């Protein structure tokens, strides 16, 4: 519960990565006490655009990706797909290692990302995003078995962003991530299935002096596995308040967050 399969996110689907350094727990939860890494996938631009790429390298590594994105009136869209495979190399080269296996340890992955947004009025928009990736990865854990892990990552999100008054905006976001992982070794098979559902309602208000953000967040985490973990579920309700004031070269920020798990 609470883990993420970063290895299942393909590089060709990433638009940019932003690193926020310093305490960020008030906005992102207790795990962000030292900062956060935000990964943004591709979205539609202001005009129609298509992209495609292929590659080939050592260990019979091949990669390909293609996509289209653009804007049509009030609708912005993006569709990206790609894949990558490699024969790999022997992960453990020392025959004296008890996990040594003379085979190559390769991988195969395929992914698709789709997103769309609709501006139904000025400063009023609806949006949705879907992502899926399948990763089949070989590794060495025993001498006589084709050890491998298959991970399927599914994620979707819907959102509504609205300006209520010139000084007041809100956003409502709901999403779910499903992470299914199955490892096969000589010693047995291990299944992990996680479901992470999140809801967030945030208000951003411009005050006569500074800005105020208020938010309510709920996170529901579920784990199904065959390893016998003691804790397989967690629900967290969070209340968040952030006040920001900038005056010339001086800046003040006050953060308050309460989590109830």
Q: Where are the regions a protein language model picked out?
A:
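Non-catalytic regulatory/gating segments with a bias toward low-complexity or hydrophobic composition
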Residues: 17-18, 37-39
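Face-selective signature of the C-terminal outer-membrane beta-barrel domain
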Residues: 117-135, 150-261
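Extracytoplasmic
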Residues: 12-14, 32-36, 47-49, 63, ...
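Short, glycine-/polar-rich solvent-exposed loops and beta-turns at beta-strand/coil boundaries
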Residues: 1, 29-33
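Short acidic, glycine/proline-rich loop/turn micro-motifs
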Residues: 1-2, 49-50, 90-95, 139-143, ...
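Short beta-turn/strand-loop junction motif enriched in small, turn-promoting residues
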Residues: 22-25, 258-260
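Periplasmic-side early beta-strands and strand-to-turn transitions of outer-membrane beta-barrels
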Residues: 25-26, 38, 45-47, 53-55, ...
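Short acidic/polar hinge/loop motifs at secondary-structure boundaries
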Residues: 1-21
């Amino acid at each position: 519960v609470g883990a993420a399969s970063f290895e299942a996110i393909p590089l060709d689907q990433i638009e940019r990565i932003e690193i926020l350094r310093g305490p960020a727990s008030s906005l992102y939860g207790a795990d962000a006490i030292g900062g956060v890494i935000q990964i943004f996938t591709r979205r539609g631009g202001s005009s129609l655009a298509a992209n495609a790429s292929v590659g080939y390298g050592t260990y019979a590594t091949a990669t390909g990706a293609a996509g289209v994105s653009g804007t049509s009136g009030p609708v912005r869209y993006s569709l990206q797909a790609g894949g990558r495979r490699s024969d790999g190399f022997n992960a453990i080269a020392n025959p004296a290692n008890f996990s040594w296996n003379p085979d190559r340890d390769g991988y195969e992955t395929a992914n698709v990302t789709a997103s769309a947004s609709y501006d139904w009025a000025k400063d009023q928009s609806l949006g949705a995003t879907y992502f899926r990736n399948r990763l089949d990865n070989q590794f060495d854990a025993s001498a006589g078995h084709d050890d491998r892990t298959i991970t399927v990552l599914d994620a979707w999100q819907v959102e509504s962003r609205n300006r209520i008054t010139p000084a007041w905006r809100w956003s409502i976001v709901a999403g779910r991530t499903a992470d299914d992982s199955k490892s096969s070794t000589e010693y047995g098979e291990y299944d992990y299935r996680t479901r992470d559902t999140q809801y967030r309602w945030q208000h951003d208000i411009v005050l006569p002096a500074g800005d105020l953000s208020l938010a309510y967040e709920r996170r529901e985490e579920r784990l199904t596995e065959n390893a016998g973990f003691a804790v397989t579920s967690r629900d967290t309700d969070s209340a968040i308040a952030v006040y920001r004031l900038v005056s010339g070269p001086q800046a003040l920020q006050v953060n308050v967050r309460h989590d109830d798990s």
